[in-house]
Structures are given as structure tokens and as C-alpha cells.
């Protein structure tokens, strides 16, 4: 008779343990889903901010280009215009990365592609901020 009780208690303990393991797995998978959703939201917000920044930089670059376009330029201003045109092309290539870098990305894996675009964005944003900052500062001084 004691053997039956031992078997029954062992069975109850094993089933309770199995249920707790199953509940732990479910809560972990729910946490993973929530973390993934949070990451998607963060990426979406980051993408919107980056898109807005790109649009603002394009607008500023176009405004600077039109400012420099209607007057005689010095050699230095001519170089600035060339850089602005190159930056505009790079910004456009960020808007359409599939078409612009199709040749560059053949044979790369996804991590290398992501790193390539991150480096490209950093390479573009640094000079753009410098190029846009100098003329805007000059325009503000003239206006003010």
C-alpha cells in the first residue's frame, strides 16, 4: 500500500514540475515576443527620425545649392558645391538602397549589408553637417 502512495505522489510531483516548466517556457516566449515588438517599435521610430533628418538635410543642401547657384563662385565655393552634389547623390542612394548598391552588396551576408549602410550613413552625415553648418552660419550672420 505504501508503494501505491509513493507512486501517486511521485506522479503528482512529476506532473507539477512538468507544468511549471511548461509555464516557464510560455512566459519566456511571451517575453521574447514583447522584446521583439519593442525592438521593432524602436527601429521604426529610429527610421522615422533618420528619414526626417535626411529630408531636412536634403532641403538644406538644396537651399544652399540655390544660394550659390545665382552668383559668381570662388574656387572654395565651387568645391563646396561639388561636395554638396556628392552628398545629395549619397542621400538619394540611401532612400533607394536596393537600386543604388545592388552591385556593392552582391555576395555579402545580411550583417555585412547592415554594416555597409551604417558606415555609409556615418560617412555621409559627418561631412553634411560640416558642409551645411558653415554656409548656414554665414547666412545667419548676414541676416542677423
Swiss-Prot record:
Signal peptide positions on this chain: 1-18
Any one annotated GO CC term: extracellular region
Entry keyword Secreted: yes
Keyword Signal: yes
Tissues where this protein is expressed: Expressed by the skin glands.
Residue span(s) of the pro-peptide: 19-43, 73-122
Residue positions, PTM Isoleucine amide: 143
Primary location group: secreted
Biological function: Maximin-3 shows antibacterial activity against both Gram-positive and Gram-negative bacteria. It also shows antimicrobial activity against the fungus C.albicans, but not against A.flavus nor P.uticale. It has little hemolytic activity. It possess a significant cytotoxicity against tumor cell lines. It possess a significant anti-HIV activity. It shows high spermicidal activity.
Name assigned to this protein: Maximins 3/H14
Species assigned in the record: Bombina maxima (Giant fire-bellied toad)
